[in-house]
């Protein structure tokens, strides 16, 4: 399984538990779009799936329609070359949280063998609630088989099943979201402050994270120093981008 840096660190145990191996494509730190040169080099005949996360945790990058079109073209070409399917797993918990009037393109529109994974916890500000859904592109020839298989897995993993009460509650607010304008205001404030202070940072297009480059080589040491100013920062070694750190802005602006 291939994924793109920076990535959510828990992908490692998710993939490891299946008996597969997660390999990380190095980041394009200029934009945090896909590094296609490195991706094509790593997309060998043993790759069964590619895991994407857009809008991205931790960078806040939103993959453009151009990026997703090129990704689909590469996957289609390589699947034909190797003579087997390559699945695209799209992790989409931040799908609605995009800024500047933009929208996150639906990844499944670009590639038939797409499995979309969604969580209500971000759009509804329900941190920690494990409630969402998995959707398979109807154009995927294995859609019915995958849905049935995932249903069996869901019943078997009891610790990750949402309560009936929460399922009923969420069903009543499917057309609602939190007020994302607060996140966008915080994004703008943080970005302006960081750039004014000389930090190197790509302006996030979504999520409630911002991902600056640390002012020293050891990002973990920098984050440790920041604690004395009541700043809880996350060094990005585990995200696949050493030398960077993640800040979250999902709090009151004040």
What are these regions (language model features)?
Residues 2-254:
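PLP-dependent class I/II
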């Amino acid at each position: 399984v291939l994924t793109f840096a920076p990535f959510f660190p828990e992908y490692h145990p998710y993939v490891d538990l299946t008996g597969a191996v997660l390999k990380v494509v190095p980041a394009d730190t200029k934009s945090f779009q896909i590094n296609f040169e490195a991706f094509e080099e790593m997309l060998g005949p043993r790759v069964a799936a590619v895991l994407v996360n857009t809008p991205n945790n931790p960078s806040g990058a939103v993959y453009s329609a151009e990026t997703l079109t090129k990704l689909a073209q590469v996957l289609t070409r390589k699947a034909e070359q190797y003579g087997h399917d390559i699945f695209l797993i799209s992790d989409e918990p931040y799908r609605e949280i995009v800024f500047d009037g933009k929208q996150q393109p639906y990844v499944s529109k670009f590639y038939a063998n797409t499995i979309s994974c969604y969580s209500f916890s971000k759009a509804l500000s329900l941190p920690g609630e494990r409630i969402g859904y998995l959707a398979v592109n109807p154009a995927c020839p294995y859609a019915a088989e995958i849905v049935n298989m995932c249903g069996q897995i869901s019943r078997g993993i009891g610790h990750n099943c949402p309560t009936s009460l929460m399922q009923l509650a969420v069903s009543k607010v499917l057309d609602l979201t939190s007020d994302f304008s607060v996140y966008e205001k915080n994004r703008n404030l943080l970005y302006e402050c960081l750039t004014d202070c000389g930090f190197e940072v790509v302006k996030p297009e979504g999520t409630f994270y911002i991902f600056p480059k640390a002012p020293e080589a050891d990002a973990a040491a920098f984050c440790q120093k920041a604690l004395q100013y009541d700043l809880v920062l996350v060094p990005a070694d585990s995200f696949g981008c050493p030398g960077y750190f993640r800040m979250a802005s999902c709090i009151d602006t004040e």
